[in-house]
């Protein structure tokens, strides 16, 4: 079950991530979703390997380009719609309303049982490591292709930067805005507790 809160043009939710867990909750180090964890890295790492070894794997530029783009497209869909939801309980998407206004939506998983409230720390690290490291590599490849005048490969590399950078941007924005939401909730909670305590003291006196 996913919950979402909405503002004018963005929709925020509280972050569901291992590092946001309170200290009194046990953290799970085991991988709870091995298939999702595998495919979270498989497509993006495979695209990088094909790019680096394309000269050895095939002499056809078109074949290598199509293979890399297919792997990047599969990675974009899997990370955006599956692995983020399963591994860290986050999902982002965008929709346009009837007035043509764009709305960013950030969702987090709401678990019913205490057992499922703890995100696997191992999965969280795998998720964020793969999410951040691979786009950085594509940026390096972009500069390398640019300075070595490999113009035909530049379009492929830019595709990698755009597709993987989009997921990175979406999840980081979700993370940052959700932290702000958690901060405002905590401030409101402690403010109510402070007022309640002061009100109780005034009544007893």
UniProtKB/Swiss-Prot annotation:
Name recorded for this polypeptide: Golgi apparatus membrane protein TVP23 homolog B
Disordered: annotated segments: 1-21
InterPro entries per record:
TVP23-like
**UniProt entry tagged with the keyword Nucleotide-binding:** no
Which superkingdom does the taxonomy of this entry point to? Eukaryota
Print the keywords alphabetically: Acetylation, Membrane, Transmembrane, Transmembrane helix
Segments spanning the bilayer are 34-53, 54-72, 126-146, 152-172
What membrane topology does this protein have? Multi-pass membrane protein
Q: Does the keyword Transmembrane apply?
A: yes
Record-stated family: Belongs to the TVP23 family.
């Amino acid at each position: 079950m996913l919950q979402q809160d909405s503002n004018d043009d963005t929709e925020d939710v509280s972050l569901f991530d291992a590092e946001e867990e309170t200290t009194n909750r046990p953290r799970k180090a085991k991988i709870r979703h091995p298939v999702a964890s595998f495919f979270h890295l498989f497509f993006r790492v495979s695209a990088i390997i094909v790019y680096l070894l394309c000269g050895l794997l095939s002499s056809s530029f078109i074949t290598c380009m199509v293979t890399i783009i297919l792997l990047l497209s599969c990675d974009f869909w899997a990370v955006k719609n599956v692995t983020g939801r399963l591994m860290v309980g986050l999902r982002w998407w965008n929709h346009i309303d009837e007035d043509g206004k764009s709305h960013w939506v950030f969702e987090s998983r709401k678990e019913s049982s205490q057992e499922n409230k703890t995100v696997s720390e191992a999965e969280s690290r795998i998720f964020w490591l793969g999410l951040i490291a691979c786009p950085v590599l594509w940026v390096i490849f972009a500069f390398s292709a640019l300075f070595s005048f490999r113009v035909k490969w530049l379009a492929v590399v830019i595709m990698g930067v755009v597709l993987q950078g989009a997921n990175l941007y979406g999840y980081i924005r979700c993370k940052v805005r959700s932290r702000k939401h958690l901060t405002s909730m905590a401030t409101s909670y402690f403010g109510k507790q402070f007022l309640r305590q002061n009100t109780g003291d005034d009544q007893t006196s």
